[in-house]
């Protein structure tokens, strides 16, 4: 091959996709895209034909928590509220409905990019976008059409992506689908297509950020940084440093434009993060282990709860290395062939999975032959890009081990900015799922373009040994797993299995003398699952290697070889993915009313004519459920990044009070007025908890009214100022919250230090309610401090008779204002000015990107016209 073909930095020829912008046929690319459409549709053909849908927890929860936002938008000409009161007594919607008018154009372009597939099947559209994104990147790398199509299949059909579709993690998947074409824009910049690179980078960065999964975008900054380093090393070797600077600036401009188009979302996500669970607590006397705390984020144990096991990493080659998913063991046909009939019913109490994670929806499997090609790249792909991609692969695997490799993880938690903001470290394996197929395709590209790379000798050794070693590291290991599984893995029993078995024995469900026999049989069943998959992976690698050897010997041309590999890998990965996303998981679509059936308890509570109150639902997992939010303003809810102070209030006060109010309902036969409510559950009262829903037998639910709820607001006769958060949250245990307010010293200037006078005639009445605007009529003879049962958050503004006034934080989480004597209208509004400022920036960036695209198209047409 020529030096130009080996170069990392070059100007694409007119034979590439990008070269054709100046002329040439796009037909091969169109055919590849049609192939992607066909593959995506066929995978979901049964759900498409029958009109079936998935019902993921995240989706259902999103509907429940988002109902107030949708109602607001429908009644306010498409305007969006940035606040909702449906869960956790109120929180911003920045991480629930992060859509802004400036991104509506992007949403339209996304629908165009999807070729209308969502109208047929949203799930097919997701897979199509994964395929198309990687294809665009490989075409930017100058891969031929069908080679790029193969690479797209290798990336898009990695098992994890189908698993997250099933789980409903759609934002994550969309973000991942836009990452490869963003990197494609970077490649174009470094290959001399500066303006096109800026436009491609800008557009796909904007789409990626719009998809709103910061964790995935953050992880791929490691990849982008290492790839940029590879281009730098190549430029230094070729004495083209100035060109590297120009390319880097071009890529940066594109990235900045894409980020600026989404600046509204990004800024408010950052602003919210400072108040969320993802930020450092102000409490210093927490009972949690100080060594478990990170400098500015979540607890280490929480971040690393889902850590990939070191041995579990073999799932990249053999998917059932640790049993696959946390599905019932009794549902696995291979396992049940080895089950003893006496124990068969017991296996409905255990799962197939025996790994270190608390549970999993499935393994990360990149394809057995893909992994073989990845190892082949180690020997035949030259240049710094290979080493940087290998480094990224190793980094992702080491970090995915989390608590199983804690020294390395601690270093990143302590010294890498933002790394401690994200949990589920196992998900960083998405980097390996990107680099492995990319390096595999670089190896195959080398084989196709330079067949001699596998012939003859290098440094005195036959090059065919590159295939031999790569086969040994994949097919050979799979064969060993099949022949001698116990040499690598012990008894196929997890610590969770042992714990559950001990519980069953202690409860008398399983005799002690049978426990060991059951465990032995379970090991045999799981061993059978593992060895069956090991043999399967060996066969896949063997077939793929045979295709390579046939091409090397001249018995097979490159086109049929590539076609054979496409079929092999598609069949292999398709079969694995169908384990975790199959037709049986789809159901008939339900309306929201069917998904959230209104219970008798809901109907009774909804008959209340009060404008605004809150409901505590004890019949569900209160703080892991959003169904209550569909009909009520809930004390609970579900969100992975709730407000930090509210989470601390849950831990310090609400959990205990929930138990006490439950007992009080039982002891008083539902007559809570007969119990000392202000001493038993004062914090629930200050949150205006007017109703409690309790579980009954046969899934029934009982609504109980709480007469101790303090309403929407009240005057207090005293303020207890405290020096810090520790004292503030502790004082809620002893303060008379009906008549006193606990306030941090920082707000003394807002509420004043003069003595307050009691006024039995003072009233606070809510006169108007909207999610982001609350109006009150406040009457008093003496004036004073009013505490409102609303969650304090920066960005809320308040006026008294139209004049602005400051808001203080009281009782750890609530709002308080100082009101003069007389009758006044108090209005609370959440319309942050930062939204308007960031929207102006976003529109400017969008206009600049559009102008660049228009200029690029005009230049291409001009060049085409004058080349005729």
Describe every region a protein language model picked out.
Residues 28-66, 255-268, 395-398, 477-483, ...:
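Transmembrane signal-anchor helices characteristic of membrane glycosylation enzymes that use polyprenol
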Residues 12-97, 276, 289-301, 372, ...:
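Hydrophobic alpha-helical membrane-insertion signals
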Residues 168-179, 189-206, 214-216, 220-255, ...:
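Contiguous transmembrane helix-bundle modules in multi-pass membrane proteins
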Residues 39-134, 141, 153-176, 294-366, ...:
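Membrane-interface coil-to-helix junctions
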Residues 308-398, 435, 447, 451, ...:
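Segments forming glycine/polar-rich beta-alpha architectures that bind adenosine-containing cofactors
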Residues 74-99, 108, 321, 331, ...:
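Extracytoplasmic/lumenal acceptor-recognition loop(s) of multi-pass membrane glycoenzymes
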């Amino acid at each position: 091959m020529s030096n130009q073909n080996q170069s990392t930095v070059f100007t694409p020829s007119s034979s590439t996709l990008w070269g054709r912008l100046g002329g040439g046929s796009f037909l091969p690319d169109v055919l590849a895209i049609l192939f992607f459409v066909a593959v995506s549709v066929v995978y979901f053909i049964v759900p498409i034909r029958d009109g079936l849908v998935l019902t993921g927890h995240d989706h259902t929860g999103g509907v429940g928590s988002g109902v107030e936002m949708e109602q607001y938008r429908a009644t306010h000409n498409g305007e969006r509220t940035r606040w909702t009161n449906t869960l956790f007594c109120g929180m911003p919607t920045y991480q629930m409905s992060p859509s802004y008018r400036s991104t509506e154009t992007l949403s339209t372009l996304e629908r165009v990019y999807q070729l209308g597939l969502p109208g047929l099947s949203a799930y097919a559209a997701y897979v199509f976008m994964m395929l198309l994104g990687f294809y665009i990147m490989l075409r930017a790398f100058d891969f031929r059409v069908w080679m790029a199509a193969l690479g797209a299949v290798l990336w898009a059909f990695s098992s994890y992506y189908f698993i997250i579709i099933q789980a409903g993690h759609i934002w994550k998947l969309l973000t991942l689908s836009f990452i490869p074409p963003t990197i494609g824009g970077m490649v174009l910049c470094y290959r001399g297509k500066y303006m096109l690179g800026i436009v491609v980078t800008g557009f796909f960065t904007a789409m990626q950020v719009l998809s709103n999964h910061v964790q995935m975008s953050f992880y791929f900054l490691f990849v982008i940084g290492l790839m940029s380093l590879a281009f730098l090393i190549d430029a230094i070797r070729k004495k083209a440093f100035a060109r590297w600077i120009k390319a880097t600036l071009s890529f940066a401009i594109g990235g900045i434009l894409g980020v600026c188009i989404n600046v509204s979302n990004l800024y408010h996500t950052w602003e919210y993060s400072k108040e969320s669970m993802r930020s450092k607590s102000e409490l210093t006397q927490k009972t949690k282990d100080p060594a478990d705390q990170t400098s500015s984020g979540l607890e280490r144990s929480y971040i690393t709860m889902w850590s990939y096991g070191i041995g579990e990493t073999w799932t990249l080659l053999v998917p059932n290395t640790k049993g696959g998913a946390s599905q019932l063991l009794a549902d696995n046909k291979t396992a049940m062939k080895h089950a003893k009939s006496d124990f068969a019913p017991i296996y409905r109490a255990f799962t197939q999975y025996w790994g270190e994670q608390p549970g999993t929806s499935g393994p990360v499997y990149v394809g057995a032959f893909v992994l073989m090609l990845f190892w082949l790249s180690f020997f035949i792909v030259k240049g710094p890009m290979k080493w940087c991609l290998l480094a990224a692969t190793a980094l992702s695997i080491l970090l995915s081990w989390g608590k199983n490799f804690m020294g390395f993880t601690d270093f990143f938690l302590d010294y890498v900015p933002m790394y401690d903001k994200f949990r589920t470290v196992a998900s960083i394996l998405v980097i390996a799922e990107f680099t492995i197929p990319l390096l595999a395709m670089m190896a195959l590209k080398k084989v196709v373009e330079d067949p001699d790379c596998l012939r003859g000798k290098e440094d005195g050794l036959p090059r065919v040994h590159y295939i031999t070693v790569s086969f040994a590291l994949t097919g050979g290991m799979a064969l060993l797993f099949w022949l001698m599984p116990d040499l690598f893995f012990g008894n196929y029993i997890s610590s969770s299995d042992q714990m559950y078995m001990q519980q069953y024995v202690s409860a008398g469900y399983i005799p002690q003398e049978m426990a060991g026999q059951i465990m032995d049989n379970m090991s045999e069943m799981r061993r059978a699952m593992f060895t069956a998959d090991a043999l399967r992976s060996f066969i896949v690698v063997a077939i793929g290697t045979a295709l390579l050897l046939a091409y090397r010997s001249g018995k097979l041309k490159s086109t049929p070889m590539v076609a054979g590999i496409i079929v092999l890998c598609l069949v292999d990965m398709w079969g694995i993915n169908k384990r975790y996303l199959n037709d049986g998981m789809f159901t008939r679509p339900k309306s929201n009313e069917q998904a959230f059936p209104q219970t008798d308890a809901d109907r009774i509570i909804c008959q209340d004519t009060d404008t605004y109150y809150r409901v505590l639902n004890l019949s569900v997992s209160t703080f892991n459920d959003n169904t209550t939010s569909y009909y009520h303003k809930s004390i609970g809810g579900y969100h992975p990044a709730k407000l930090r102070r509210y989470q601390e209030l849950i831990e310090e006060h609400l959990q205990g009070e929930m138990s006490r109010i439950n007992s009080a309902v039982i002891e008083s036969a539902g007559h809570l007025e007969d119990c000392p409510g202000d001493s038993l559950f004062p914090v629930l009262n200050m949150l205006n908890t007017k109703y409690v829903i309790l579980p009954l037998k046969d899934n029934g639910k009982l609504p109980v009214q709480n007469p101790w709820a303090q309403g929407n607001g009240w005057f207090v006769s005293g303020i207890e100022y405290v020096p810090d958060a520790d004292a503030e949250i502790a004082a809620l245990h002893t303060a008379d919250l009906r008549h006193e307010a606990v306030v941090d010293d920082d707000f003394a200037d807002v509420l004043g230090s003069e003595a307050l006078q009691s006024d039995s005639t003072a009233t606070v009445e809510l006169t108007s309610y909207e999610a982001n605007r609350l109006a009150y009529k406040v009457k008093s003879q003496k004036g004073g401090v009013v505490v409102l049962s609303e969650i304090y958050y920066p960005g809320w503004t308040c006026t008294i008779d139209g004049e602005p006034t400051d808001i203080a934080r009281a009782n750890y989480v609530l709002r308080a204002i100082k009101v003069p004597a007389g009758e006044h209208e108090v209005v609370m509004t959440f319309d942050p000015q930062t939204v308007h400022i960031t929207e102006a920036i976003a529109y400017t960036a969008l206009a600049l990107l559009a102008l660049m695209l228009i200029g690029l198209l005009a230049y291409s047409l001009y060049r085409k016209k004058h080349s005729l």
